[in-house]
């Protein structure tokens, strides 16, 4: 949510930020509605003052025994009361319209974000690891002999339809091991607090984390109004909604392993084979709630946490900073980490690490109390995948595949797999 005062003070800067995203100028529309709202509030306050003045005069007229004046003033008070109520209702309606308009306007990109139209204009900032050289044509994850029978899309389609998968046996265990490894690393080495959070949330939680009102079609809603979380960013971030947190308690760093649900609206025909794009998937999320002065440094720290998971697993990756035209609605700056996927001979996104600045905090009214006793200020919130578990499974399987259909698994998973680091061509751990 944008600060209306900042738009009033510098509408040109507001429009320039929208232009960098490829959006049309909106300051004139916003300020026109804001001015109408403020004028109606002022008119209501003036009418209220007139009502109060007339109400006080009633007593004096009654004391004087001036019955005619008493009746006139009483009628005036009744008229003013109705006028005030009508004006207040109009002001409330205008305020709701202004809030709705602001809620649909994307965050302003940071100054250092590269300008661009789409993913082709993203800028690579890091590349790690050597892409494996195979003496055979590498297969996609669902084609590898040791995986094929354990990754059951046919049964999933019978149960739920397209874009679902049933994992069985050793592959299901590897998937679980990856999630456990991620959470343990974030807690034991990166200092995050593990949270077991709900995956059903209220409208307010989706709104506060900028998923509503614009992106409701991308998520699933139950018949009684709850939303299935598209990411655990929603419950973790919204946990501080309405709070005023002591500065000394910052930063707050959370991690959670949850199911996530997305309708994938607009993705028809994309990644229809395999596990890359699913309606239901698992993700280990990182959320940081910090002082504004430390948010840029915190984003770098979170990025390092996500990259570190891939490095421990030995998965080659590259990191890109998204251009203005490819950033998410609520992001101020986003880094994508893309893992090497040999079966497609390319890098695929496995994590996004974003700072929203105070964009979400304003929607949630989440603030902190400065140590010097000053007025409460809005927090900064950040979120990042650490990592998408299914996509990490894909990267592990494809990068570790062997010519005989077996898969060599990363050493980092040994504690979670009983020391067995080979998935045989028959689909067993050995």
From Swiss-Prot:
Subcellular location: Cytoplasm
Gene Ontology BP term (one): selenocysteine biosynthetic process
Record-listed L-serine binding positions: 231-233, 285, 385
Reactions this protein catalyses: tRNA(Ser) + L-serine + ATP = L-seryl-tRNA(Ser) + AMP + diphosphate + H(+); tRNA(Sec) + L-serine + ATP = L-seryl-tRNA(Sec) + AMP + diphosphate + H(+)
Keywords recorded for this protein, A-Z: Aminoacyl-tRNA synthetase, ATP-binding, Cytoplasm, Ligase, Nucleotide-binding, Protein biosynthesis
InterPro entries: aa-tRNA-synt_IIb, aa-tRNA-synth_II, aa-tRNA-synth_II/BPL/LPL, Ser-tRNA-ligase_type_1, Ser-tRNA-synth_1_N, SerRS_1_N_sf, SerRS_core, tRNA-bd_arm
Keyword Metal-binding attributed: no
Main location: cytoplasm
A cellular component annotation (GO) from this entry: cytoplasm
Function: Catalyzes the attachment of serine to tRNA(Ser). Is also able to aminoacylate tRNA(Sec) with serine, to form the misacylated tRNA L-seryl-tRNA(Sec), which will be further converted into selenocysteinyl-tRNA(Sec).
Subunit field text: Homodimer. The tRNA molecule binds across the dimer.
The protein's name in its UniProt record: Serine--tRNA ligase
């Amino acid at each position: 949510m944008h600060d209306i005062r900042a738009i009033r003070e510098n509408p040109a800067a507001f429009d320039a930020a929208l232009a960098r995203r490829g959006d049309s100028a909106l300051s004139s529309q916003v300020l026109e509605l804001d001015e109408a709202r403020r004028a109606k509030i002022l008119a209501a306050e003036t009418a209220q003052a007139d009502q109060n003045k007339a109400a006080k005069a009633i007593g004096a007229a009654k004391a004087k025994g001036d019955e005619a004046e008493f009746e006139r003033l009483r009628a005036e008070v009744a008229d003013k009361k109705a006028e005030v109520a009508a004006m207040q209702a109009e002001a409330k309606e205008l305020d709701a319209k202004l809030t709705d308009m602001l809620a649909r306007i994307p965050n302003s990109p940071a100054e250092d974000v590269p300008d661009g139209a789409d993913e082709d204009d993203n800028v690579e900032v890091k590349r790690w690891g050597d892409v494996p050289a195979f003496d055979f044509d590498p297969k996609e994850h669902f084609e590898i002999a040791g995986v094929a029978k354990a990754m059951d899309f046919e049964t999933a389609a019978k149960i739920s339809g397209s874009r679902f998968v049933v994992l069985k046996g050793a592959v299901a265990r590897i998937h679980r091991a990856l999630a456990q490894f991620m959470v343990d690393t974030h807690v034991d080495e990166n200092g995050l607090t593990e949270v077991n959070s709900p995956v059903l949330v209220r409208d307010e939680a989706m709104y506060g984390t900028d998923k509503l009102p614009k992106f409701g079609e991308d998520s699933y809603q139950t018949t009684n109004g709850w939303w299935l979380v598209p990411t655990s960013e929603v419950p973790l971030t919204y946990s501080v909604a309405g709070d005023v947190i002591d500065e000394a308690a910052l930063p707050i760093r959370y991690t959670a392993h949850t199911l996530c649900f997305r309708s994938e609206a607009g993705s028809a025909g994309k990644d229809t084979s395999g596990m890359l794009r699913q309606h239901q998937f698992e993700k280990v999320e990182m959320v940081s709630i910090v002082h504004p002065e430390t948010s840029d440094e915190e984003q770098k720290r979170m990025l390092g946490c996500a990259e570190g998971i891939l490095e421990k697993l030995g998965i080659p990756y590259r990191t890109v900073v998204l251009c203005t035209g490819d950033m998410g609605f609520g992001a101020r700056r986003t880094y994508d980490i893309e893992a090497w996927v040999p079966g497609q001979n390319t890098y695929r996104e496995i994590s996004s690490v974003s700072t929203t600045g105070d964009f979400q905090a304003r929607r949630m009214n989440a603030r902190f109390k400065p140590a010097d006793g000053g007025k409460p200020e809005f927090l900064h919130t950040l979120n990042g995948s650490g990592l998408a578990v299914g996509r990490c499974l894909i990267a592990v399987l494809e990068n570790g595949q062997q010519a005989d259909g077996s898969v060599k698994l990363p050493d980092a998973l040994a504690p979670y797999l009983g020391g067995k680091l080979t998935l045989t061509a028959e689909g067993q751990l050995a």
